[in-house]
Amino acid sequence: GKTAEEAWKRDRDRGYISGEYIWTGFDYIGEPTPYYGSYPAKSSYFGAIDTAGFPKDIYYFYQSQWSSKPMVHLLPHWNFENDDSIKVDGDKILVYAYTNANSVDLYYNEDVNSKELGELVGTDTYEVTNAGYNKSYKETKEGKLHLEFKVQYKPGKLTAVAKDKNGKEIARDEVKTAKEAKKLNLTADRQVVKANGSDLSYITVDVVDENGTIVPNADNLINFEVSGNGKIVGVDNGNAASVERYKDNKRKADHGKALVIVQSDSNAGSFTLTATSEGLSTDNIKVYSVNEEDTDKMEIVGYDVNDITVPVNGKLELQDKVTALYSNGSKGEVAVTWEEVPSDKLSKAGTFKVTGTTKESNIPVEVTVTVKDIIGILDSRVLTGINDKVELPKEVSAIFNDGSIENHLVTWDRELTDEDVKSVKTVEIEGTVEGVSGLKAKVIVTVSDKFKMKNIAVNEGQEFPKAFTSYEGADNINNINDGVISKNNSPQNRW
């Protein structure tokens, strides 16, 4: 029943206690304390690391107490535009800094992309406390093992500058307000694995905004596909209340993150994981698999190169150096010479590859370039009743050739009239999309005198909707949406 800080202080200050174990380091399936019997809780909540292997904030508390390497970790995230639930003293948010430094200066800058610290919000400092047995510890005068600030919420960037006892900066951390989710970003713990049919690469998927900042409230459904010498053996997001399958090719993000575990086969080569999500730009990552006898060698097997997206008629900037991946798992920067790219390649939407060479290997470097442009405007649809003159939407959705979707303001050629909604009919109105040329928006208004509420998930004897399951148990899965609710054995369909 103790918090992490309370438990550690109690053990720390007793000279006869040599250390502390925590229960648990990792979350695990089962024992969802205190939510026993509360669907959909399925795993523990008290681990310092979740089931996907992502560190929670409390992980950094232990790091601040047990690590000698300078560190500071800020929490919470900084996306609270429409959330007053954690505010204190009216409109302020309690910001923690876990650190093993002596003090922390907290700065605020409204520009998330600025390299400047901005204005000083405040400073909090530890006092050095003698534990009474030849050991000293840092804690605040109130006895806290973290530093804290009360900060008025405004979108922007908070930066923590941690300093030692001499006032010298030794660590830094920051949290930024994320904008709308725009793309997926994949990173692998290892991009070179053994081709033995059992080695694993753990690939993290981040949902990020246009600046590359993780969107902390993103829960997009992400689909995965593997090509080449590997297969997906597990997916997760660390959410203790998620009942999604671990063996699947899709997963919803939790707080902007998900995990895919890919297993190599027994053939040396490579595999590519591609992640897609509706409305977001796609990403992929290539992992190389090598024979076990080659894992001690220092040979280039491939390169870690990020795909590039540029607007139509934009400037293509290729890197002078790329990251080489070696058979022993190490990485290194090597210079690359790229082929010439004709200017007309950038004049229209599409995708093409650019090839480069390095002096260190005969293996070519390849980067995929997407020339991004709007390829269509989704029709807007409005349903209304007779004599009900509704307001037309103020925005429409533009679809790009990279799969992303953006909303744009629209000016309709006209508004709905009384005549439009006088009788049952369908009315189509076009509009001009702000910032888009050559494409018109369209809203389709259906005027009806018949409205009927219907549960479209219920099967009423037709072929669809059809229920299915990945595991066939004793119960008939088709009973789940036959419209019959059974709380006992009459009728005996258990749904």
What are these regions (language model features)?
Residues 153-157, 200, 268-270, 349-353, ...:
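Extracellular Ig-like/FN3 beta-sandwich strand-entry sites
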Residues 1-143, 148-153, 157-169:
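Extended substrate-binding grooves/exosites of carbohydrate-active enzymes
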Residues 329-367, 403-447:
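Serine/threonine-rich, repeat-prone extracellular segments and beta-strand-based repeat modules
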Residues 450-495:
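Compositionally biased, intrinsically disordered or flexible polar/acidic segments
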Residues 147-153, 247-266:
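Short, hydrophobic beta-strand segments
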Residues 64-94, 100-101, 170-202, 206-215, ...:
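Short S/T/G/P-enriched beta-strand
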Residues 114-129, 181-186, 225-242, 293-295:
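Short aromatic-acidic-glycine turn motif
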Residues 95-99, 161-162, 198-216, 222, ...:
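Beta-strand-rich structural segments
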